[in-house]
Amino acid sequence: MSTVPAKGPLTPQQLSLINRYWRAANYLSVGQIYLMKNPLLREPLQPEHIKPRLLGHWGTTPGLNFIYAHLNRIIQQRNANVIYICGPGHGGPGMVANTYLEGTYSEIYPAISEDEAGMERLFRQFSFPGGIPSHAAPETPGSIHEGGELGYALVHAYGAAFDNPDLVVACVVGDGEAETGALATSWHSNKFLNPARDGAVLPILHLNGYKIANPTVLARLSDDDLDNLFRGYGYEPFFVEGSEPADMHQKMAATLDTIFQRIQDIKKNADVHSPERPRWPMIILRSPKGWTGPKTVDGLVVENYWRAHQVPVANCRENDAHRKILEDWMKSYDPSDLFDEKGALKPELRALAPKGEARIGANPHANGGLLRKELHMPDFRQYAVNVTEPGAIEAQSTKILGDFLRDVMKLNETEKNFRIFGPDETASNRLGSVLEATNRVWMAETLDMDDHLAADGRVMEVLSEHLCQGWLEGYLLSGRHGFFSCYEAFIHIIDSMFNQHAKWLQVARELEWRKPISSLNYLLTSHVWRQDHNGFSHQDPGFVDLVANKSADIARVYFPPDANTLLWVGDHCLKTWNRVNVIVAGKQPEPQWLTMAEAEKHCEAGLGIWEWAGTEDGLEPDIVMACAGDVPTMETLAAVDLLRQSLPHLRIRVVNVVDLMVLQSPHQHPHGISDEEFDRMFTTNRPVIFAYHGYPYLIHRLVYKRTNHSNFHVRGFIEQGTTTTPFDMTVLNELDRFHLAMEAVERLPLGESVAKPLIDNFTEKLALHKDYIRQHGEDMPEIRDWKWTWPR
């Protein structure tokens, strides 16, 4: 167990100054939670000085302020490059207070000036209508992590540290957050951090003992158990424990001196080509919850107990005794010793804060758009599949994309600003070509038989979707680019992380000072229609439904039907910013439909009429066969083949959709097509049989305001699955060619004499299919060997 000597490095004057600075941050934090007037307590507190609704979290805040003050000291002392990730983001008052003290806040928000009037506005705006949120939200300078939903602080910290060799990411992990699954696995991120090319992450485990109303698990472990636990993870824990401020300041200062020297030594001694995994230092900080706040309220323990978690003194407007407790509490910080007559922080305290971009709140790594550089991109057309006739050849679309991504990796090797992420699926998802340009990063033990593992790899693989998502978010938020491929069904593991990132982007877009960051790009493959071998557990296309719920300024969903369209979409997504792009594409051999020139035109429009597949010949169609997704596209064309053979005079229009959001009105989504264009594509009164990759209701939801919505008949995944054959997956969900053809026949005014024999024939085919697969274990030859044979 590592501790520092009892005698600390601070002189009496330094100790007094840093304690006063901490008191100032605590004072401002309490003021934000409680006050809307009288910010410097120049008169006795009155009910009208108190906010009518008291919102915020005090318990974690003094510890966060303590850490911030000491990071300021080490930044000044060592000219260190530090950002601060606040895992307990509900301690937002502290993060706002500290950026105000250092001057960053007033530079960004001039109305919150460094005087009494500005302080009043600072207090009033917190958790107040028209003001700012209660957490370390995008509005907070220096934050890349809101910390509302807990679990992602440490993984964001590592993401920010990758490829930032001069950066130290101080990451506070609350002991409540430490109980989450995502955080628990994040400790293993040190096996992927290369000291020769990456920055350092300094985890600070803040053990204040309690969550909202319960003790925390780690806080009830002995120091020996904690030391053994984190040494097992590969860290060297340093303990800073106590409640007496002077003693704690000395301990923290000495500990940070030791740790930053340790980090410097680790990086100095790291071998660029084959660095060994070091034992990175971390801090375990034991301090009271609600430190320096009221010890009791109404005879009940508050400080160092869960009652300090949110608002320790709850009824300050109506209850005179409570208001007196608050006033005494705030006066205990002695504001006249901290702020001058105008309400500005006294100069000797302001001198403790770093200057310029060295300030935590002004560090450009926490406003990654300032550092973002465009990727050097190959010409995606060079990877085109040579399509002479629609459906004449097959290819693995994601394998073609892998070749493209390999060269994106090569072209950006010098910049070192592009990584690929995946939960042990890069090769499985047919992106293995990228390993021709780089390796999988790996700092743990390696064996002679290991393949493509290296300390300097740029493919991040670990069997945790949480880590892949979190690393990528941290990497993007600090100004870089990335690409995340995942099995479609298991991307649901990070549904909530996606939610939080999308919310962050939505707010950040409205802040002029936050510059755009690279988009979060997903490739969802090994998808529902080709998970016949793994079964029902692997069959779920619902992630896109979640994405479609998000702001239209953020969400994009693409269903490229073949390799050439996938190349266009992949290239496009890597060039965008402030978006979440979801690409759904299969990895198995599939028919290739469009030439590259056709693919470009099709993708730029987002959807299009495939005239070569239809029979309308410039006339109004009798029926529209629409599709979105590679397998639905193939089944739609196979259904069209059946209809063309059975009903040669039928006028069929085939519409393929790549960009799902074009289906919405332009009033709902910026990619939406006009009502006039929609009606031109889908008609105003003809039946539309829409074969969709996912759950059918999403298409109905997107088009419900369109003229012809009542004639849309959508087929997709209806939660029927098992281990079976590929074609049987479509049959189980009635998305196959026979069901699509029957739906078309039933919707057309053909008369029973024409319709019934066709339906009987298609029904018989389905019965034959069922018998055949149960006897032979594979699809019928006419299904396996089907090809589109109609000439252009």
Curated annotation (Swiss-Prot):
Name recorded for this polypeptide: Probable phosphoketolase
SUPFAM superfamilies per record: Thiamin diphosphate-binding fold (THDP-binding)
Top-level enzyme category: lyase
Domain of life according to the entry: Bacteria
Stored InterPro entries: Phosphoketolase (IPR023962), THDP-binding (IPR029061), Transketo_C/PFOR_II (IPR009014), Xul5P/Fru6P_PKetolase (IPR005593), Xul5P/Fru6P_PKetolase_C (IPR018969), Xul5P/Fru6P_PKetolase_CS (IPR019790), Xul5P/Fru6P_PKetolase_N (IPR018970), Xul5P/Fru6P_PKetolase_ThDP_BS (IPR019789)
Keywords: Lyase, Thiamine pyrophosphate
Organism annotation: Brucella melitensis biotype 1 (strain ATCC 23456 / CCUG 17765 / NCTC 10094 / 16M)
PROSITE patterns, sorted: PHOSPHOKETOLASE_1, PHOSPHOKETOLASE_2
